[in-house]
């Protein structure tokens, strides 16, 4: 009997996302319920954004939750390497096989040509897609260009008509017209694969039998199915999981909800409660109980109990469930966990240099730096009153800085400062006009340790959470303001 093998394949391009943890949990439970194996693979082909620091954060976040893997970059295994950036020769080999078999082709189109193609198609009211012009090149012309070292990509051929049937373990057969599919790039001009080729090759070579992934990938499933057909490989069983949603039913995003697992760890949530809550996202125990452990979820896991309605990720409900877990701890364990959370040595070492020079006794540390150990702050609206800025301008400054910080890929003091500086310059203000607002929102005080250092230490999710909290206190942002300010944001460098 074939061993069930599932996997999670996150990209190390930022803080570990709760959506990644959610999909990892369901893959883990499915594998373990069937006595199988769970694999961790790192999709780091985006060399500009991928970092080893983010990769380590993924490892740490999953392990904090209690999710372990049988094979992966840090534990090894018989199907490595487990980082896609280390598998370049493998992908090149299989891409060449597709070209030789007539299932893929070399494309030498420049970015300018592709942009013109898209513009012309849009002008005609057509859906932009590659028009296949490289297929008209003769074999001799293709070879001449390859020999000359012209930049190129490899694209897959797709049918122009007919229906692809996607067998989904949750929805049954899903029919998707082939005319919605583009001639997908498989190998980029930097020699690295796109998601589609790497995903299929890796899942096959690693013996993955079942793939549970987010439903946002369902519309592009025909491309993956066609690649399996081209290679002559057996396709894993597919399951497209419902996406996590904000309370307003929109897709879970950092603009409306803290999305980093690290944020919830920093806020003092228990990993058991976090995992329990993620397990309730679209799934339920047979007896409908709300509180259950990972072991209990594995024991009773059944895909048929997954609801297709978008599960709502609500921090208030998570907090309630976390309270249930906390209050049931033995007092000794509660105290031990509290001490471990509050006096994390690595975190304390980040904070200590910024408070040591400003206190005369240890008892003064808490009033000065207590905000480092809090989640939501009790903010005072008076702290946001400005002699120079109107109430509307105050909200505008905070909102624009929040938006700029949301696009920040590397969370460093210099880059945080750059975001704030860009906003104040665009509004023809001075840095000193904005910094009191940052002190008020981030520390809950009129002054404290360097707020820029504090923002770097607190991290992106907690910083953005507090800025959103400040905006809510000040009345929020109207739809009209949101539209006007987003236009202004687009003009800020």
UniProtKB/Swiss-Prot annotation:
Give the location in the cell: Cytoplasm
Q: Does the keyword GTP-binding apply?
A: no
EC no.? 6.1.1.17
Sequence motif: 'HIGH' region, positions: 10-20
Sorted alphabetically, the Gene Ontology BP terms of this entry are:
glutamyl-tRNA aminoacylation
> According to its record, what are the GO cellular component terms?
cytosol
Q: Which domain of life is it from?
A: Bacteria
| Record: residues binding ATP | 254
Which cysteine pairs are covalently linked by disulfides here? none
What Gene3D superfamilies does the entry give?
1.10.10.350, HUPs
Q: Which SUPFAM superfamilies match?
A: An anticodon-binding domain of class I aminoacyl-tRNA synthetases, Nucleotidylyl transferase
Family annotation (PANTHER family): GLUTAMATE--TRNA LIGASE, GLUTAMATE--TRNA LIGASE, MITOCHONDRIAL-RELATED
Q: What does this protein do?
A: Catalyzes the attachment of glutamate to tRNA(Glu) in a two-step reaction: glutamate is first activated by ATP to form Glu-AMP and then transferred to the acceptor end of tRNA(Glu).
Q: Which NCBIfam families match?
A: gltX_bact
The record describes its quaternary structure and partners as:
Monomer.
What name does the UniProt record give this protein?
Answer: Glutamate--tRNA ligase
Record organism: Pseudomonas putida (strain ATCC 700007 / DSM 6899 / JCM 31910 / BCRC 17059 / LMG 24140 / F1)
What gene is behind this protein? gltX
